[in-house]
Amino acid sequence: ARYRSMYSGVFYDRYIKGLWAVAEGIIYDMFKKEKHVVDVSELMANGLIFVGDKYVSIDYGTQNPTVFLLWELGNDKNWYCTSEYHYSGRSEASQKTDSEYVEDLKEWLGDTKTRFIIVDPSAASFIAELLKNGFKVKKANNSVLDGIRLVATLLTEGKIFFDVSCIETQKEFGSYVWDEKAAKHGEDKPVKENDHCMDSCRYFCYTMLRRMSGISVLKPKNSR
């Protein structure tokens, strides 16, 4: 009963009702700005304290946007994305090198110390540059559908939140959609657009939080 009220769309049909529903429309339709977007500085003024390790998840692009997201654990046991970096070589008409992105990362982090930088494993040259500069790197688990399901669960259960400053991430939550052409052939996959913040978010959640205590990721009632 508790899950029935929390899920909607394709997640509700598959995981609650056990139906094979076509994946269409907004992927994270459970994301609500009024619930998931918070003013971290205001919360800290009211008693939120960040504890333990901090992480950065990165979706790396050359022409496509590169995104850094900073993740911090609150004393309420929820995770907060407290800061966002977004740079598009295409939009800015100027690509950055691996070393320029690493310098941007250092400047963006300032005095913040991180446990790991979580990066898409395909970004080999960028990972090498990070390691050369003394960062500890964890290669992201890039399971797309399982990762999406976990992010959906974390959003639904109120375990992840985003600071008001994370503008591009908020935009992508509203425009990240299922690929309807693929769905017609029985394949679930997102449209490869408006997905760079979404990929970065998924990398962190699926790499670091999938074994988090108290989270049970729903599986479809019936396999296809």
Regions found by a protein language model. Give the residues of each.
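A residue-level signal for conserved active-site and pocket-lining positions in enzyme catalytic cores
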Residues: 16, 59, 68, 117, ...
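Mg2+-dependent endonuclease catalytic cores in nucleic-acid-processing enzymes, primarily RNase H-like
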Residues: 77-192, 211-215, 222-224
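Charged phosphate-binding loop/patch that engages nucleotide di/tri-phosphates or the phosphate backbone
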Residues: 13-14, 25-26, 202-220
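Short, solvent-exposed loop/turn segments at secondary-structure junctions
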Residues: 21, 62-63, 124-125
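ATPase catalytic-site recognition across NTP-hydrolyzing enzymes
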Residues: 1-58
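Charged alpha-helix within mobile-element recombinases
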Residues: 7, 190-205
